[in-house]
Structure formats: structure tokens, C-alpha cells
């Protein structure tokens, strides 16, 4: 089976928020026989909510057959420096967990960095060796 990873800082599941484009895209790819995992921050954008990672670097959940990985990030409020720190913590957290996640669940064939902010696209480039 082919594996496809989607990196989007603000992606949510139907249970965690309204930003579902990546969830629905993953469902569509699953119907086509492509195992798709969505990676997102555990601090939920525009809701003030947070997915508890239980003190671990990430929490893997599955909703309606779509694996979601919530990466532990710093809390933020508004559009100030705390939000920039949150973006950086997602970037660094995702880099930190990716190789171990690939070892445990299988390497991706494709990585898509969905551009929520400038750091998002760098993930795919920096993790190209995972697809080799």
C-alpha cells in the first residue's frame, strides 16, 4: 500500500474542529487505496482547544479510518509572538518525531506540506530522505 503524509499545522478532525479540508482529502485518498496520515498541531487554531498528548511528543488517533498525529506545541493566543513560537514548536516537533514515526508505521511515499505558514513547506523538503 502506498503511504501519503499531509503536514498542516491547523488541520482538524470532525471531533476537534472545523478545519476539515485535509481530513476529507485523506478520506478520499483512502478510498483510492492510499494510506494517508495527517499531522497537525495539538493546539487547535481559532478554538482555544487543545488535544492532550499526555506529556508525549505526539498523540496518534484515528477517526473514521483516518490516522491523525497531533504534535505537541506551545500554547498561543492571538497573532503575537506566542503564535510565532507555536509555529516554530510545530516545525521542530514534527522534525523530531518524523523519523521515529516512519520507523514504527512505515515510510511515506509522498509528503505534502500544506502551506498554512512559511515553515510548513520546509517540512517536506527537509524530510525527503524518508521517502527514499
Language-model region placement:
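Short, solvent-exposed loop/turn segments at secondary-structure junctions
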Residues: 11-12, 43-44, 75-76, 117-119
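N-terminal subdomain of nucleotide-sugar transferases
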Residues: 1-64
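A general structural motif
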Residues: 1, 33, 107-108, 132
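An aromatic- and histidine-rich active-site surface loop
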Residues: 14, 84-93, 98, 108-131
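Intrinsic disorder/low-complexity signature
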Residues: 19, 106-109
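A conserved catalytic-core segment of Leloir-type glycosyltransferases
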Residues: 38-105
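Short glycine-/acidic-enriched loop or helix-start segments at secondary-structure transitions
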Residues: 16-17, 48-49, 80, 121-124
Amino acid at each position: 500500500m502506498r503511504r501519503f503524509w499531509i503536514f498542516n499545522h491547523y488541520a482538524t478532525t470532525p471531533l476537534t474542529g472545523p478545519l476539515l479540508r485535509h481530513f476529507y482529502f485523506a478520506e478520499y485518498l483512502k478510498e483510492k487505496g492510499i494510506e494517508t496520515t495527517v499531522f497537525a498541531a495539538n493546539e487547535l487554531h481559532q478554538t482555544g482547544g487543545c488535544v492532550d498528548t499526555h506529556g508525549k511528543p505526539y498523540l496518534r488517533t484515528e477517526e473514521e479510518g483516518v490516522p491523525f498525529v497531533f504534535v505537541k506545541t506551545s500554547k498561543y493566543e492571538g497573532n503575537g509572538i506566542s503564535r510565532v513560537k507555536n509555529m516554530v514548536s510545530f516545525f521542530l516537533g514534527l522534525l523530531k518525531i518524523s523519523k521515529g514515526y516512519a520507523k514504527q508505521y512505515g515510510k511515506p511515499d509522498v509528503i505534502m506540506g500544506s502551506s498554512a505558514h512559511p515553515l510548513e513547506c520546509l517540512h517536506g523538503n527537509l524530510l525527503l530522505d524518508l521517502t527514499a
